[in-house]
Every structure is written in structure tokens, then in C-alpha cells.
């Protein structure tokens, strides 16, 4: 095993007994190396090529192993924050996704709305696990689009805690791991009601409804004034009505997912009382300076933020959607066929954990060095994809496995390099 990858996995040894850690390390390495469907039985063939351990040990490790996923999330969060955000505010993204499953009895699976396939006119439901994921937003050294590295997760169950309660739970857990840090949390408009109930030190950015009922801040009480203090001021026009204003707009330069843009912005401090309670918000209406896009209506609870920061923060939220796609498509997060006990939830969680570890390893070992092969039809490629990072790690692990004695390789270097290249890109 690569020394750097081995050191990364060793960071989690304290969460397991020695036998369980060996299964954990071999399982994650096999997950990286396995081409095609990531079923547990297929991973077992790579993890135990000589059959030294029964395959049921891997099923039992996920289904009923005496270890806690929360301990792994804590160790992962400490690892990621120390590497990418050692100081300053910690940027987080929050969203939920559906892992499709099939089978008559998959623990905690149910029918959920499939946000990817649903439209405004047609709602599509699918069977699977509904997962709430909290990720760390990372700006890679090569620039461009940010990355969203998962550092906590909860399984949303039918009849269980609502998504809002689970969201407050995962955020509170991360706060307990970093008690002296402040956080910038970003989520889509569905999670806007969180703004009024987040702990101190968490600043929230989300989308604002176009027809939101906004109010002025309550007026200051006069000396000797009787009666209850007012909770809100006078009713304001809706954001859509405010956007019709001809004055008050100003032009700003923003950076959205690594690209420079020109925007016209209109801002105002207000109360979205029926959603955020008495927490004041900064409303930001963002307009495309060229008039090609619809207006965006955003808000943040950080009243000191600039419009440019609010727009860039919300635009960067798309990184977590990239994470969901990559985990499903390249890590086969939906593939493990484990149906009972904690198996389905743990397998899904490990796929997100592995995604974060692959990117951390790649940034630490490769940095800005080009590790991918330029293709004739894509000569201008300047930044790595997750598949490039995964292929780089596969190449290192396959080379170590096939040619452990590098001083006297059994194949000619040209043949060995070609073999490793093919294996590393087999998906």
C-alpha cells in the first residue's frame, strides 16, 4: 500500500479494534481498485485475493460491526479542517440525495421524491435511501470550481426525524468538534427555515422566495413606552416587487465557481418573519448585467457580508451536487448489496467518506502537477476531475500490489507502465 494512502487510513485506526481496522483498510482499498459494480462480494475478491478471510466477515463488518460511524466522521472532519481550513470560518454545504436501491427488504429504504428526475410539472418517486450530507467546501490549489468534501451524514427515515431536525443535528455535531470556530453554511431554498434556529457562530446563506413576506426591523422602543415590544416592523414589498425598482442597483464583479462575472445587485436588511423568525437577514437581488438570466433572490444571516460574497457563496453550493454525481457514478455508492441492520446506511456513508479521502490524498500528493493524459480532443484541459484523482490513486495502489519489489520488476518498464495505466482507468 502507498505510504501516503496508508497514513491516511491509519488516521481512523482509533475507531476500530485491530481486526476490524484491517477489514476497513482492505475494504476501502478494494473499493478504489474494483472496476465495475461495487458489490460487497466483488470488493471481497480484491480485498482478499488469497481468500484469507471469509466473505461473511465483510458483510458482518457493515451489518453489525461494533464500531460507530460518528467516530469516523469526527476523525475525518478533524483531518479535512486541519488540511484545508486551519483558521478562519469553515465553509459548509448541506443537501440531501437519494441512493437508489432494489429488493424487497432493504433496511430503512422507502419511496422518496427523486429530485433529479422530477420537474415542476411531473413528480417522480424512486425506492432507496434518503441521505442528508454536510460537506466542507474546499478551493483546490489549481483554482477553478470548488470541491465539496463530505464530513457528516444522516439517514432520513420514513416516520423518523424530519430533515430539518437532522440538519440541526449534523451541524450541532460538527460544532461540538470545533467549539471555537465559526461556520458559513449554505443550502438551497428548501432549508431556508434553518436560518432562525441555528446556533451562534453559524452564518447561513440560501435562496429567498420571490414572494417572501418581508418586514422592516422593529423600531427601537422609546423611553417609558408601554406595551409589548414589537417583533417586526412595517410590511415591505415582495422581493419580486423590489426588483422592479429603477434605482438602488449597483454593478459588482463576482467570482462564481472559478469564473468572473458582472452582476447588478440590490440589497436590503429585513425580517423574513414567518420563516426565519426574529433573525434579521441581508437580502441580495442579483441580476445578470447582460440580461440573459433570470434574477436570483438570495439572503444571508451574516449582515456584514458583501453582495459579492453572498453570490459567490451560493454559486459554490453546486459543488455538493457534483459530489453526489461522482460518488454514485465513479464510486458506485448505490451498488453495495447489503440489506440488513446498519449495512445500507454504513455502506452509503463509507462511499462519501472515501470520496473525501481520495481528494485529500490527491491534493496532498499531486498538488498542481498534471497527473492526467491529454487527449487529442481535449488538449486544453487544465484541471483534474474526480476520475483523474481516482485513477491516480488506483495507479499507485496497483503498482504497489503488482510490483512490490520495484528494484527488480518482473516486466519491462514500458509494459508495466501500460498495464498500470489501463488498470487505473478501468471503471
Q: What are these model-predicted stretches?
A:
Residues 1-12, 20, 47, 88, ...:
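Single, function-defining residue in the core of a domain
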Residues 10, 22-28, 41:
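Double-stranded DNA-binding cores of transcription factors and transposases
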Residues 16-20, 31, 35-104, 110-111, ...:
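Electropositive nucleic-acid engagement tracts
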Residues 26-31, 351-355:
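Contiguous, well-ordered alpha-helical segments that form the cores/surfaces of helical PPI scaffolds
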Residues 28-31, 61, 183-190:
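Conserved short loop/turn motifs at secondary-structure junctions
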Residues 30, 63-145, 151-153, 255-256, ...:
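Active-site-proximal, Lys/Arg-enriched surface segment
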Residues 39-52, 135-144, 275:
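Glycine/proline-rich, flexible active-site/cofactor-binding loop segments
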